[in-house]
């Protein structure tokens, strides 16, 4: 008789100790498959679409489907020995236990938007656990204003679509998360999560009320069974350091029947510098119903190089109220009624995803996962706590033109963000004025091309230093940047992790380390920038 997954997990400690050392490559697949079969009760022949060795016809398409940075999609990019395309929670449990028994590194990938490929690349022998099939979304509008259980493999577009579908007859609801619809919910939320309602509602994790995670022992834990410390840690500290996130329960938020969006662009000869300078004083302090993203991009106009400044906005209200507000607070913007479009909230989701015809297309477009789609890119991030002078902005614009293709994206905080304690979640940056994303994209492959663009990105990062936070220079976990430090997981693991950990988490790093030490003392869940365990104290002789 086939035993249940639970029974097999209970007896997992009986797995042969001979598997503690990785077997030869020729038997890795067979060893893992047998372990996986034992854990799940499924015969090996039924697992050919779940456990994928490199020889499988499904291996490359599955691996490539959610590699979102083409830098890591080349013939020389490190490849996992196995991809596990989990179809059930039981598959995730078995993956953790069997990977641990074989002494391999496990990378967990939901949407594949990790900017530096940490969720699917390693220089050590590794397996990839692909969560894209675990994307069930269950919305309950009767639960205290609306809630939803969201599988880690669901995309934000799928989340928004399901909320829209379910709330049609219950008033309009939404969820404060990112504007890119193909981002995976698991990584986005566990890293903090933000979007264009951040000033109204705060971070995505501020609306997480429960979660399910597979721990290092293969157990499925919810908020009650994992305890508040671990629940706190996975709400902004990155879930991959502590286990495998299966799903989050989120609380929905009300949005008005009509919202307003606009885009205004100016170049330097059109007094863009005045607009950019004033933006710093308005965007973080205006009505929390208004989110104004600022983007700076070098462009060519009439054969002359310049910088284009774009303000892209969402206002949770009517156009007339928006015009009254910005005519008074931000005349330098020069906003006109014809710049604005009123629409429903779900239409604004599509508009922010670069669908200019959002008022006529159907929301089903949000269900397009757009697999096997990637460009070459590098991202970095900064936080600003004091407005940059006009001279400083002029300097940065000149350096942008020198860099050629590098763009900056300024995201204002304030509003709800400034009302929440910096220790409420691992995300410590709530009191800043705004966040800056450094964004470099290019089209052509090649090592020399990549080196050139990476060097330009890093050079500009050094030019930005005088204008951003210091000691440490803070950065955002979900804008992963391996330039700020890598953990080799040797004897200096804690010290190496502290370098990047303080930049991502500030003083919250200390609590994250304590949680990590308690729940994963052997550091099974590790990557290039994971949370370390506390250093072992030398024994006294």
UniProtKB/Swiss-Prot annotation:
Tissue expression per record: Accumulates in cell walls of etiolated hypocotyls.
Record-annotated disulphide pairs: 35-98
Record note on cofactor: Binds 1 FAD per subunit in a bicovalent manner.
Protein localization: Secreted, Cell wall
Cross-link 6-(S-cysteinyl)-8alpha-(pros-histidyl)-FAD (His-Cys), where in sequence: 113-180
Residue ranges of domain FAD-binding PCMH-type in the record: 76-255
Cofactor(s) the record lists: FAD
InterPro entries: BBE (IPR012951), FAD-bd_PCMH (IPR016166), FAD-bd_PCMH-like_sf (IPR036318), FAD-bd_PCMH_sub1 (IPR016167), FAD-bd_PCMH_sub2 (IPR016169), Oxid_FAD_bind_N (IPR006094)
Post-translational modification: The FAD cofactor is bound via a bicovalent 6-S-cysteinyl, 8alpha-N1-histidyl FAD linkage.
A Pfam entry, by short name: FAD_binding_4
EC number: 1.1.1.-
SUPFAM superfamilies: FAD-binding/transporter-associated domain-like
Top-level lineage group: Eukaryota
Residues linked to a glycan: 25, 38, 73, 136, 302, 339, 357
GO MF term (any one): oxidoreductase activity, acting on the CH-OH group of donors, oxygen as acceptor
The entry's keywords: Cell wall, Disulfide bond, FAD, Flavoprotein, Glycoprotein, Nucleotide-binding, Oxidoreductase, Secreted, Signal
Gene Ontology CC entries for this record: extracellular region; Golgi apparatus; plant-type cell wall; plasma membrane
Signal peptide: 1-20
Similarity comment: Belongs to the oxygen-dependent FAD-linked oxidoreductase family.
Protein name: Berberine bridge enzyme-like 1
Organism, scientific name: Arabidopsis thaliana
């Amino acid at each position: 008789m086939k035993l249940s997954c639970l029974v097999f997990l209970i007896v997992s400690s009986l797995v042969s100790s001979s598997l503690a050392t990785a077997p030869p490559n020729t038997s890795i697949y067979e060893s893992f498959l047998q372990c996986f079969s034992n854990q799940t009760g499924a015969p090996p022949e039924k697992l050919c679409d779940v456990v994928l060795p490199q020889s499988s016809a499904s291996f490359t398409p599955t691996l490539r489907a959610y590699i979102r940075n083409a830098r890591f999609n080349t013939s020389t990019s490190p490849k996992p020995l196995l991809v596990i395309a989990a179809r059930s929670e039981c598959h995730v449990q078995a993956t953790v236990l069997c990977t641990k028994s074989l002494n391999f590194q496990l990378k967990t990938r939901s949407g594949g938007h990790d900017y530096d490929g940490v969720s699917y690349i390693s220089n050590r022998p590794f397996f990839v656990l692909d969560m894209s099939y675990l994307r069930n979304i269950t919305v309950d509008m009767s639960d205290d204003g609306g809630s939803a259980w969201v599988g880690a493999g669901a995309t934000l577009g799928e989340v928004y679509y399901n909320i829209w579908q379910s709330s049609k007859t219950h008033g309009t609801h939404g969820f404060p998360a990112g504007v890119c619809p193909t981002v995976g919910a698991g990584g986005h939320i566990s890293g903090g999560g933000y979007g264009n309602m951040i000033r109204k509602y705060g971070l995505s994790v501020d609306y997480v009320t429960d979660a399910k995670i597979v721990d290092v022992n293969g157990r499925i834990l919810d908020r009650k069974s994992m305890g508040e410390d671990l629940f706190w840690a996975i709400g902004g500290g990155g879930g991959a350091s502590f286990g495998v996130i299966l799903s989050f329960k989120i609380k929905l938020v009300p949005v008005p029947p009509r919202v307003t969006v606009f885009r205004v662009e100016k170049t330097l000869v059109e007094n863009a510098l005045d607009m950019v300078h004033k933006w710093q004083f308005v965007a973080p302090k205006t009505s929390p119903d208004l989110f104004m993203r600022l983007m700076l991009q070098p462009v060519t106009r009439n054969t002359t190089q310049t910088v284009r400044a774009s303000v892209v906005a969402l206002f949770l209200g009517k156009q007339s109220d928006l015009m009254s507000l910005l005519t008074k607070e931000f005349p330098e913007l020069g906003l006109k009624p014809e710049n604005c479009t009123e629409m429903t909230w779900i239409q604004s989701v599509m508009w922010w995803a670069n669908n200019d015809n959002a008022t006529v297309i159907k929301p089903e477009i949000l269900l397009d996962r757009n697999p096997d789609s990637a460009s070459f890119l590098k991202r970095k991030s900064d936080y600003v706590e004091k407005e940059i002078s006009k001279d400083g902005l002029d300097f940065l614009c000149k350096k942008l033109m020198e860099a050629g293709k590098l763009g900056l994206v300024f995201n204002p905080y304030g509003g709800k963000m400034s009302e929440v304690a910096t220790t409420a979640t691992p995300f410590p940056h709530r009191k800043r004025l705004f966040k800056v994303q450094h964004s470099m994209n290019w089209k052509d492959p090649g090592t020399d091309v990549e080196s050139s663009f990476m060097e330009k990105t890093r050079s500009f990062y050094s030019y930005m230093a005088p204008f951003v936070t210091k000691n440490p220079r803070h950065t955002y976990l979900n804008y992963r940047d391996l330039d700020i430090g890598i953990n080799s997981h040797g004897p200096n693991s804690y010290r190496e992790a502290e370098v990047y950990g303080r930049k991502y988490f500030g003083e919250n790093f200390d609590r994250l380390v304590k949680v990590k030490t308690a729940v994963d003392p052997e550091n099974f869940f590790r990557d290039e920038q994971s949370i370390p365990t506390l250093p072992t104290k030398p024994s006294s002789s």
